[in-house]
Swiss-Prot record:
Annotated InterPro entries: Ribosomal_uS2, Ribosomal_uS2_bac/mit/plastid, Ribosomal_uS2_CS, Ribosomal_uS2_flav_dom_sf
Protein name according to UniProt: Small ribosomal subunit protein uS2
A biological process term (GO) from this entry: translation
Sorted UniProt keywords: Ribonucleoprotein, Ribosomal protein
Alphabetized GO MF terms: structural constituent of ribosome
Chain spans, region Disordered: 232-251
Gene (name only): rpsB
One term under GO cellular component: cytosolic small ribosomal subunit
Amino acid sequence: MSKFQLEQMLRAGVHFGHLARRWSPKMKPYIFMEKNGVHIIDLKKTLVMADEALKAIEAIASTGREIMLVGTKKQAKVIIAEQAERAGMPYVCERWLGGMLTNFSTIRQSIRRMNAIDRMETDGTFDMITKKERLMLLREKDKLVRILGGIANMNRLPAALFVVDIKKEHIAIKEARSLGIPIFAMVDTNCDPDEVDYIIPANDDAIRSIELMVKAVADTIIEARSLQEEQEAIAEMDEQVEEDAEEASND
């Protein structure tokens, strides 16, 4: 069953594209019409393609792998952070650091530095250094947390990316493509859909449109993870029953 309804998408403004003069011709198959100089997205196609994307996201999440949520534009950053944290997924909602994927080992060093400063605050180290040194370390930590806090617990490359605004996040898109990491994205009428593996034709500027899509992604991940945990618990119980039965037969 679909997580979306056409009326719900209309209320969220998912159908509003960009000015027709700013369009990408490759988005023509997903455009319903032009109205007052603005392209209107075909929501029937959005509905189908969003459902296909969510099924693929569910398949990834059900294996325990991570999906990184990316959206650094003003309208998206709070939504990305809230929904990613709710789903327990890594995210980037501030600046995308070049090499965040392609040079992940170096990024991990910065994360370790961030965690080291965090430990200094609690293990007594701060009591043994000057006020100026403490201030410098706290400023360094704040900067690292702002940029890397969303991936602090990410120990390996994500299995996929979900992106809001592929034009703005072009560096993230380029890095993911170079590594063969699947890309799910909201793709507006001014974007190149060829850069994305799972296209969701949608308004990537309106807050309600972004929230609708990102929340659906988070809900899908949470449901898939919950089902995975249930299946693992059942498997453990079955294994324990078999072990108990084997012990009983040997007595």
